[in-house]
């Protein structure tokens, strides 16, 4: 299955609690931290909810 790399590029400080929880649930902590996750509907939905805070790249 395909994988995606998610990088936290903006701070969740001052954002809604749901958005902050989504950042933590994805395993992102500090700015510029990255995680590699499976590309599925659940992860894509989480990324869409915080798309203004993260960047997404395909991993080959």
Swiss-Prot record:
Part of the 50S ribosomal subunit. Signal peptide: none annotated. Keywords: Ribonucleoprotein, Ribosomal protein. One of its GO terms (biological process) is translation. SUPFAM superfamilies: Ribosomal protein L30p/L7e. Disulfide bonds: none annotated. It comes from Streptococcus equi subsp. zooepidemicus (strain MGCS10565). This is Large ribosomal subunit protein uL30.
């Amino acid at each position: 299955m395909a994988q995606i790399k998610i990088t936290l590029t903006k701070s969740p400080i001052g954002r809604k609690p749901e958005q902050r929880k989504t950042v933590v649930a994805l395993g992102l902590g500090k700015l510029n931290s990255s995680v590699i996750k499976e590309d599925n509907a659940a992860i894509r939905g989480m990324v869409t909810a915080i798309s203004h805070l993260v960047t997404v790249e395909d991993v080959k």
